[in-house]
């Protein structure tokens, strides 16, 4: 059973764990992070809000020595410049910290595909050698032609070397539970069992 541990931002407030695995979820504001986390663990661990920019802290959820880390969304302009800079600084520091194993799941709204700000985050994550996997959310909103176009564009990013060959991608819908079983299986088999 997953449980909420704490909200943190500055380094002295981070959860300290030497021998644990942290799966981090990050994405643009309002990409559907909280809904995905709740669907993923099949329990309500994260508050779902229609208002973008709601998550402003690093939120930790724990089950034994496994952690889910919900990072504040990026690209939300309604916060003050100072608050955005502070959040960006501490998120960057958190992701660079190598005290425990971290794996990043970057959430992309399937309706927009990878945006300019997503590309910036991908470049940063690649530069710090963090394992990255992509989750295209809200896939139920796309028709078959749009899904095919999304997959084609994703493959172009793979070919362009922006994404590593080890980057996996998942098409999911938290609402309709599409793709969740594959995602859960991947996490259990390839991350938590290591």
UniProtKB/Swiss-Prot annotation:
Positions that bind GTP: 27-34, 53-57, 70-73, 137-140, 172-174
Source domain of life is Bacteria
Q: Which GO terms describe its molecular function?
A: GTP binding; metal ion binding
Provide the residue positions that the database annotates as binding Mg(2+): 34, 55
Question: InterPro entries annotated for this entry?
Answer: G_ENGB_dom, GTP-bd, GTP-bd_ribosome_bio_YsxC, P-loop_NTPase
GO BP field: division septum assembly
Question: Residue limits of the EngB-type G domain?
Answer: 19-193
Q: Which GO terms describe its cellular component?
A: cytosol
Q: Which Pfam families match?
A: MMR_HSR1
The entry's keywords: Cell cycle, Cell division, GTP-binding, Magnesium, Metal-binding, Nucleotide-binding, Septation
Please indicate if the UniProt record lists DNA-binding as a keyword.
Answer: no
Q: Which cofactors?
A: Mg(2+)
- Similarity comment text for this entry: Belongs to the TRAFAC class TrmE-Era-EngA-EngB-Septin-like GTPase superfamily. EngB GTPase family.
List, alphabetically, the PANTHER family matched: ENGB-TYPE G DOMAIN-CONTAINING PROTEIN (PTHR11649:SF13), MSS1/TRME-RELATED GTP-BINDING PROTEIN (PTHR11649)
- Function comment: Necessary for normal cell division and for the maintenance of normal septation.
This one is known as Probable GTP-binding protein EngB
Provenance organism: Mycoplasmopsis agalactiae (strain NCTC 10123 / CIP 59.7 / PG2) (Mycoplasma agalactiae)
Q: What is the lineage of its organism?
A: Bacteria, Bacillati, Mycoplasmatota, Mycoplasmoidales, Metamycoplasmataceae
